[in-house]
Design a protein with these regions (language model features):
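A short, acidic, amphipathic alpha-helical segment used as a generic capping/interface helix at domain edges
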Residues: 77-78, 283-298, 315-316
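Short, acidic/turn-prone active-site loops that include or flank metal/cofactor-
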Residues: 49-55, 60, 124-125, 257-262, ...
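Peripheral docking tails and interdomain loops at the edges
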Residues: 317-350
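Acidic/His-rich segments in extracytoplasmic proteins that coordinate ligands and/or metal ions
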Residues: 73-149
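A charged, amphipathic alpha-helical module
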Residues: 2-24, 137, 141, 145-265
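Proline-aspartate-enriched helix->loop->beta-strand connector
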Residues: 85, 294, 298-304
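An N-terminal, globular interaction/scaffold subdomain
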Residues: 25-97, 101
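Redox- and metal-dependent alpha/beta enzyme cores, enriched for Fe-S-associated oxidoreductases
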Residues: 30-50, 227, 233-293
């Protein structure tokens, strides 16, 4: 767990050493980027994140104030901190990510920030249609060819199958982590869960998997963590500030449905082929039916946390509240990394 804590705290530490040894580092934004292809190409995939309190500087000038602050903070890190990246992949997982891609592409075209790496869009769609599956397969074939040219080596079927199998093993370990957060265990806090999962987006898969399995072994015999069990929905959390504030106030975050979480709601493993990956990413979701998530986690309350300029979760709250057998609270217009704990309390911890 100590090694995973360190990787989470400095998510570019391994990228710097990887590059120093002549390797290629591919940064990515959003969970729809098929990291299996990056791994199969022999490159290190590193997911970018924001940091509350980071000065926004030129990022605010380029994108404006009407974009989710997590995306603005991520953008500011790219502009001002020059992370060790050779290539950046941006998925079409949200409008904020798409705006980020367009801004980066235009900035590079104009030569305004010469230190930025090349940026490509990964346009994976999620409609339940055969035409969508065909479209996604074309996009993944295109990404495969471009990665092959970029790294100067072919991505053969055996390498792709091995990478897909390795990433599926990671997902299985994350599901085991979700069990340890559930009833009868409560072996780790939400902050710890977010850390253990997030570290995996900064390490090579073959280094991360044994560390995560080791952490599962360490956690198996732990005494239950204290706190009122809380299920979190709404905006994603790429850093632990909100979790820490909630747990300092007496809650215990036992599950979430955002793509930085433990992935308990993800579909079964993908077939280890490009066609299989295209279908898996088409159907990929981290959202369980709300009542099923409450039953699995044993949550006593549900919190829908919604950041300013990330309004999509607002549309879901009424249906979520109607579906769950426990109290549900909507907390809207929250600042990135912060939470109004007094408004969450209700009949929870004091």
């Amino acid at each position: 767990m100590t090694a995973l804590d360190a990787a989470y705290a400095d998510r570019y530490a391994r990228a710097r050493s990887w590059r120093g040894q002549g390797g290629t580092v591919v940064g990515y934004v959003g969970a729809d980027v098929p990291v299996e292809l990056v791994t199969a190409a022999g490159a290190l995939p590193v997911r970018l994140s924001g940091r509350p309190g980071r000065p926004l500087g030129h990022a605010l000038e380029y994108l404006g104030a009407g974009v989710d602050a997590a995306t603005l903070s991520l953008f500011a890190g790219l502009l001002d901190e020059a992370p060790p990246l050779d290539l950046l992949l941006v998925s079409h997982d949200s409008e904020a990510s798409l705006q980020l891609f367009y801004a980066l592409r235009e900035i590079r075209r104009l030569g305004l920030e010469p230190h930025l790496p090349p940026v490509w869009l990964v346009d994976v769609l999620h409609l339940p249609h055969r035409s969508t599956a065909a479209y996604n397969l074309v996009r993944l074939r295109e990404l495969r060819r471009r990665l092959e040219r970029f790294v100067g080596a072919a991505i053969d079927d055996d390498a792709l199958a091995a990478a897909a199998a390795a990433h599926d093993e990671v997902r299985a370990a994350r599901r085991a982590l979700a069990v340890l957060r559930g009833p009868g265990h409560r072996a780790l806090t939400g902050v710890e869960a977010l850390t253990l999962v997030g570290a995996g987006s900064a390490l090579p898969v073959d280094e991360y998997l044994p560390l995560l399995r080791g952490a599962l072994g360490e956690l198996a015999g732990r005494e239950p963590r204290p706190g009122v069990p809380l299920l979190l929905t709404g905006s994603a959390h790429d850093e632990p500030g909100v979790y820490r504030s909630l747990e300092d106030d007496g809650w215990l975050v036992v599950g979430e449905d955002h793509d930085w979480g433990d992935g308990a709601g993800e579909p079964p493993p993908a077939p280890p082929t490009l066609d299989g990956l295209a279908e898996w990413y088409q159907s990929r979701t981290v959202t369980e039916p709300p009542a099923a998530a409450v039953a699995r986690t044993g949550a006593h309350h549900v919190l829908s946390y919604v950041r300013t300029h990330d309004d999509a979760p607002l549309w879901d709250f009424r249906a979520v509240a109607a579906a769950v057998p426990v109290p549900a609270v909507l907390l809207a217009a929250q600042e990135y990394g912060a939470v109004d704990v007094a408004a969450v309390r209700g009949d929870g911890p004091r």
